[in-house]
């Protein structure tokens, strides 16, 4: 799976989980500030991403992921390992 495929899959997950249009989920859109996610939304996002990619995101790493690009970068490293 290449980075573009990961980007599109995560973009869809974020859009569905937060109930926002995919066009709003840009690579730099902050989950909380730009997309209106609260702490529960963020936990649910992490769980959905873990399930979709069959990976585990440690709590300390999850706290550092606040936008789509950061999520894609983390997932790319995990699936490449």
From Swiss-Prot:
Location(s), subcellular: Plastid, Chloroplast
Superkingdom in the source lineage: Eukaryota
GO biological process, one term: lipid A biosynthetic process
PTM entry text: 4'-phosphopantetheine is transferred from CoA to a specific serine of apo-ACP by AcpS. This modification is essential for activity because fatty acids are bound in thioester linkage to the sulfhydryl of the prosthetic group.
GO cellular component: chloroplast; cytosol; membrane
Entries under PROSITE patterns matching the protein: CARRIER, PHOSPHOPANTETHEINE
Keywords assigned: Chloroplast, Fatty acid biosynthesis, Fatty acid metabolism, Lipid biosynthesis, Lipid metabolism, Phosphopantetheine, Phosphoprotein, Plastid
Pathway stated in the Swiss-Prot or TrEMBL entry: Lipid metabolism; fatty acid biosynthesis
A GO molecular function held by the record: acyl binding
Modified sites of kind O-(pantetheine 4'-phosphoryl)serine: 39
Residues covered by the Carrier domain: 4-79
Record InterPro entries: ACP (IPR003231), ACP-like_sf (IPR036736), PP-bd_ACP (IPR009081), Ppantetheine_attach_site (IPR006162)
Keyword Protease: no
Family according to the record: Belongs to the acyl carrier protein (ACP) family.
Protein name, UniProt field: Acyl carrier protein
Organism: Guillardia theta (Cryptophyte)
Organism phylogeny: Eukaryota, Cryptophyceae, Pyrenomonadales, Geminigeraceae, Guillardia
Gene: acpP
């Amino acid at each position: 799976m290449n980075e573009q495929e990961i980007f599109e899959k995560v973009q869809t997950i974020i859009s569905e989980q937060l109930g926002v249009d995919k066009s709003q989920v840009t690579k730099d859109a902050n989950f909380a500030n730009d997309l209106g996610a609260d702490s529960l939304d963020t936990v649910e996002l992490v769980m959905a991403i873990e399930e979709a990619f069959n990976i585990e995101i440690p709590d300390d790493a999850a706290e550092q992921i606040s936008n789509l690009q950061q999520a894609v970068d983390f997932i790319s490293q995990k699936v490449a390992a």
